[in-house]
Amino acid sequence: MPDFGANDLDAFWMPFTPNRRFKRHPRMLSSASGMWYRTPESREVLDATSGLWCVNAGHDRPKIREAIQKQAAEMDYAPCFNMGHPLAFQFASRLAQITPKGLDRIFFTNSGSESVDTALKIALAYHRARGKGTKTRLIGRERGYHGVGFGGISVGGIPKNRMYFGSLLTGVDHLPHTHGLPGNTCAKGQPENGAHLADDLERIVALHDASNIAAVIVEPVAGSTGVLIPPKGYLERLRAICDKHDILLIFDEVITGFGRVGAPFAAERFGVTPDLICMAKGLTNAAVPCGAVAASGKIYDAMMDGADAPIELFHGYTYSAHPLACAAGLATLETYREDDLFARAAGLEGYWQDAMHSLADARHVVDVRNLGLVAGIELEPRPGAPTARAMEVFETCFDEGLLIRVTGDIIALSPPLILEKDHIDRMVETIRRVLGQVD
């Protein structure tokens, strides 16, 4: 292994990482191709997490790599304030062809966190443009993850994401989560119980009045909190209540977008169309940072018609629609289409589901959840040391040649959509073996 001295490791303050623990036992990746990472020691590691839920088409896709190289040689950067470049408009048009019907106005960001904060700001500005400026309250959900911007952590519901950063945004409420309901343990696909929890939105409306509520934001499938699948009928109820009270519904599809659940977006999988969709990750196969918000025509038209200044939305980023990101995104969408990866994910769901639920009797496992090509395997916490068991499983799996993701005491799996059945078998065999080794 290369010599990573103390100074080499000290400079980088790593995100979402126990830095002190990492430096005692660093894990390094040096290259990637297809389903595999390679370490500096030339050891192969099977990617069961698509990097961080984002390399949906697999690593080192030639079409994407070559598009980035070509664009970098032609034009490395172009601003999109008061001017544009052709790829930005091409990318937006192509993306609008696969978003749910009616969500065809695209605002580019650089990450999922930025997409969430952008969607929240659009929701507030939309109501103001319609002369309903009192509609400012935002509704999130317990255990929700919406990135790390101040808007996202305010509507998010993971305590560790919130507790260190003060009072956050005011005027935010949270719906109850749907985790751990009786009768839902080891449900395959959508669980039967829990749709009634959406009705808590009516309680919040009664408390604050609909005239003060702007939007509800949820992940259709809550990923970072441990793969929580929405109960049957839950999202439909949220949509109906939002419609009843003129409240916008925002889907955070940063994880679920681009084939993860066997459809372009979870909105289509569940048959529920929101007013705004947040996306990132699989948008460019993670080759270049990029995010986007897809907005409905009614929102865009209201902003254009109700603007009280030449600039209809005072919002944007230096790197919005970055030329390299647009090149990567266009090539990524073409790769999804050429390889029919969304349908491929749907076709593998049955095998994936059976394989994941075969772990229900493995040591320490208390629940298994799945949808599309995503799964959560929940472990019994180690007494007096929550999260310690899952972290040890993560580290041991890596040493055994498998990259997984853990959140709390839950193993989260989200492999590239190019995986084969033998990859699934290997994941299950490794996880079962490691669970048998870890106390």
Swiss-Prot record:
Q: Which residues carry this modification: N6-(pyridoxal phosphate)lysine?
A: K281
Q: How does activity depend on pH?
A: Optimum pH is 8.5.
What's a GO biological-process term for it? biotin biosynthetic process
The UniProt record gives the binding positions of pyridoxal 5'-phosphate as G112, S113, T318
The record's section on Pfam families has: Aminotran_3
What cofactor is this protein dependent on? pyridoxal 5'-phosphate
Query: Does the keyword Transferase feature in the UniProt annotation?
Result: yes
Activity as a function of temperature = Optimum temperature is 50 degrees Celsius.
- If you read the UniProt record, what top EC class would you report for this enzyme, in one word? transferase
Q: Please report any disulfide bonds recorded for this protein chain, giving both cysteine positions.
A: none
Could you tell me the keywords of this UniProt record? Aminotransferase, Pyridoxal phosphate, Pyruvate, Transferase
Q: Which Gene3D superfamilies match?
A: Aspartate Aminotransferase, domain 1 (3.90.1150.10), Type I PLP-dependent aspartate aminotransferase-like (Major domain) (3.40.640.10)
Among CDD domains, the record links this protein to:
OAT_like (cd00610)
Q: Which GO terms describe its molecular function?
A: adenosylmethionine-8-amino-7-oxononanoate transaminase activity; beta-alanine:pyruvate transaminase activity; pyridoxal phosphate binding
Q: What is catalyzed by this enzyme?
A: 3-oxopropanoate + L-alanine = beta-alanine + pyruvate; 3-aminobutanoate + pyruvate = acetoacetate + L-alanine; benzylamine + pyruvate = benzaldehyde + L-alanine; (S)-1-phenylethylamine + pyruvate = acetophenone + L-alanine
Q: EC number(s) in its UniProt entry? A: 2.6.1.-, 2.6.1.18
Q: How does it assemble?
A: Homotetramer.
What is its biological role? Aminotransferase that can use beta-amino acids, aliphatic amines, or aromatic amines as amino donors, and pyruvate as amino acceptor. Shows high activity for short-chain beta-amino acids, with the highest activity for 3-aminobutanoate and beta-alanine in vitro. Displays higher activity toward aromatic amines than aliphatic amines. May be involved in beta-alanine biosynthesis and/or degradation.
Per the record, the similarity remark reads:
Belongs to the class-III pyridoxal-phosphate-dependent aminotransferase family.
Protein name as annotated: Omega-aminotransferase
- The record lists the organism as Caulobacter vibrioides (strain ATCC 19089 / CIP 103742 / CB 15)
In the UniProt record, the gene name given for this protein reads aptA
